[in-house]
Every structure is written in structure tokens, then in C-alpha cells.
Amino acid sequence: MRLSRRSFLRSSSLAAAAAGALPALAEPRGETGKPSPVKLGMCSYTFRNFTRDQMIPFLKQLRMNELNAKDAKDHLPVDPVQEAAAVADYTANGIRLHAAGAIYFRQNSDDAIRAQFEYVKRAGIPVIVAGDPTPETLPRIEKFVKEYDIKIAIHNHGPEDKLWPSPLEILPDIQGMDPRIGCCIDVGHTVRAGTDVVEAIHRVGPRLFDMHMKDLTSFTDKESQVAVGDGKMPVREIFEALTAIRYPGFVDLEYEVHADDPMPGVIASIAYMRGVLTGMGYRE
């Protein structure tokens, strides 16, 4: 059963976790429970209106050291010199880049696709979150996946996306391709496409390479995004499904509302997810 934020805060064990997390996420985590099989990360797109120098202190406040970086602002510039400076900044601050994107493959040519793989390789990132590869582009992309040993996680974009509204539309087109070609499930876009997100996780299984987490008050309204825990997203069931398939990747918060002041919603979202994991008997 899904916990609302109110029910979550009324639960004695979870209330203790949330009470400590909401006002001061920089406080040390508790050491009770088993290590969590669900690993939380952050989409840098959440902080798209902030520079890297502004974002890094936010991540430290959140005690978050895993980042899905995008070329928004100066988060992960395409220019090689600027990109190297960004990677050095993250490394110096203990932040690991586990995914890049969303990255778009707008040209079906070797030169254009190689440029994207080189960009990600320079940063030492193992996963590309791909926004728009077409079925016709995938065989060419597969060639570079094999050459660079970098995974491609195709990101679904809901009912507006004529190619990949949900992960279930991606699977038929990658069947039989290199196992490093898979999905990034965006939970909000998935439910808006009318797909059961928990079922989708089980169906995608070993081809799931990244997750974008958000919450909605209406599964038919793109504009209804709220902090995780304030909507209808079945967060605990999602975490249970990820645990069941032994998902090795990250659940990256993509908080797209209040772009000029995202931290209140981000703090509430991270606190809620950490509290759910505590309630499942885990420590992050």
C-alpha cells in the first residue's frame, strides 16, 4: 500500500527518520538496518537554473554524491576543456557522475553519434540517458555501444512522445540488440502513458539502467508534479520492484517544478524516499 506523506509522518519509525531529514539533511544518517539495495541520485536538470558552483553546495546539503549530469548551465559542458574542469570540480567534492543526459541523437551519422560518446567517455560516465534515438538510428548507436562499452538508456517521455511513450514501447525495438542498450524509466511519463510503472520495471528487468523519479497528483496531468510523497506515485512498490529485479543503478530525483527555488521540494522528496527505505528496513 502506498503511503501518503501524512501517513508516512504519522508512522513512528518513519517519522523519526523524516523529522531528522527535513530540517537538516546534512546530519549523519542512522546506522540501523541493512544497506539499501536502492541507491538514490540526482538529475542535475533539477538545478537547471543554477550554476555548478551553486549546485554542488545543494548536493552537499542533501548528502547526495551521485549525479546524472546534463549540459544545462555549466553542469557538464560539451567543450572538452570546460568539461574537464567540471569533472575535476565534482571529483574534488566527492560527487560521482553515474549517468549523462538526457542526450539527444538528432543525426543518424557516425560523426554525430561518435561526438556524443566521446563527450561521455571524457567524463568517465558509464551510462548515456538517450532522449530521442529512433529505431532507424539504433543499429548505428549499437556499434558505438560496443566500441565504447557505454550503456544506452532510452528515456521515455509520456503520451506526447510518438516513439517511446513508455518503456514497454522501447522493448520490442531493442530486442536482440546488445544487452547494453536498455531503458531509463521516467516514472512520471510512464504513468501518464497509462502504463503500470511497477509492471514496467519487472518487464524491463536487466535492461533497466537508470530511473528518473518524480510524483504527480494526477496521472493524466503533466503539470501536476509535486514533491515525491505528495502525489499518487507508488514509491514503496517501485522500490520493492527494483529490489526484486536486483536493479544495480540509481533512482535519480528529477524535480522539474519551481525551477528558481527547487530546494524545498527536493528536500521533501529526498526525505520521503529515505524514510520509505527506512520503513523497508534499509539504511541508505
Where are these regions (language model features)?
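Histidine-acidic metal/acid-base catalytic patches
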Residues: R2-K39, N49-R63, Y119, W164-I185, ...
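Mobile, glycine- and charge-enriched loop segments
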Residues: E31-T46, V87-T91, R96, A100, ...
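Hydrophobic faces of well-ordered beta-strands that scaffold small-molecule active sites
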Residues: V38-C43, L67-A69, L97-A102, I128-A130, ...
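Short, mixed-charge, low-aromatic patches
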Residues: L40-T46, A69-K73, G94-H98, G124-G131, ...
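Active-site beta-loop-alpha junctions enriched in small/polar residues
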Residues: C43-F47, K70-D74, A102-F105, P133, ...
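Short, exposed beta-strand "edge-strand" segments with a Pro/Gly-rich flavor and a Y/T-containing core
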Residues: S44-F50, D71-V81, E160-P165, G229-M233
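Structural motif corresponding to the early beta-alpha repeats
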Residues: N65-K151, D161, H189
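A generic hydrophobic-segment detector
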Residues: D149-P172
